[in-house]
């Protein structure tokens, strides 16, 4: 008698419905550049959205690491007054 929409999953003390999961997957789909650019290709499976989300997060993390390394190298190559100024700007 329970429909797909009314089913829920219990995670700890909270309940989440299939409809809420579908809404979250749709929100992720809209955020992913790879999938957002291909909207006319039709419906994308939740599995694909989650795989693309994981891949996108890994890529963003790698970019952050690379930029952090570049910034560290830049700060090492500048004099201490300039480095202090850059650090103070970054902390704001």
From Swiss-Prot:
Main location: nucleus
Keyword field: Gibberellin signaling pathway, Growth regulation, Nucleus, Transcription, Transcription regulation
Description of the deletion phenotype: Pale-green sepals and carpels and decreased chlorophyll levels.
Domain bHLH: 5-60
Classification via Pfam families: bHLH_ILI
One GO biological process term: regulation of growth
Tissues with expression: Expressed in roots, leaves, stems and flowers.
Classification via PROSITE patterns: BHLH (PS50888)
SUPFAM superfamilies for the chain: HLH, helix-loop-helix DNA-binding domain
An example Gene Ontology molecular-function term: DNA-binding transcription factor activity
Domain of life: Eukaryota
Assigned GO CC terms: nucleus
Swiss-Prot/TrEMBL induction comment: Not induced by exogenous gibberellin.
InterPro entries membership: bHLH_dom, HLH_DNA-bd_sf, PRE
Localization, UniProt: Nucleus
Function: Atypical and probable non DNA-binding bHLH transcription factor that integrates multiple signaling pathways to regulate cell elongation and plant development. Regulates light responses by binding and inhibiting the activity of the bHLH transcription factor HFR1, a critical regulator of light signaling and shade avoidance. May have a regulatory role in various aspects of gibberellin-dependent growth and development.
Complex and partners: Interacts with HFR1 and IBH1.
Name used for this protein in its record: Transcription factor PRE4
Protein species of origin: Arabidopsis thaliana (Mouse-ear cress)
Lineage: Eukaryota, Viridiplantae, Streptophyta, Embryophyta, Tracheophyta
Protein's gene: PRE4
């Amino acid at each position: 008698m329970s429909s797909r929409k009314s089913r829920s999953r219990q995670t700890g003390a909270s309940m989440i419905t299939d409809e809420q999961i579908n809404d979250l997957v749709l929100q992720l789909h809209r955020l992913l550049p790879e999938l957002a650019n291909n909207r006319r290709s039709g419906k994308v499976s939740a599995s694909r959205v989650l795989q693309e989300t994981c891949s996108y997060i890994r890529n963003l993390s790698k970019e952050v690491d690379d930029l952090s390394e570049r910034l560290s190298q830049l700060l090492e190559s500048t004099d201490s007054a300039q480095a202090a100024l850059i650090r103070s700007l970054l902390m704001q």
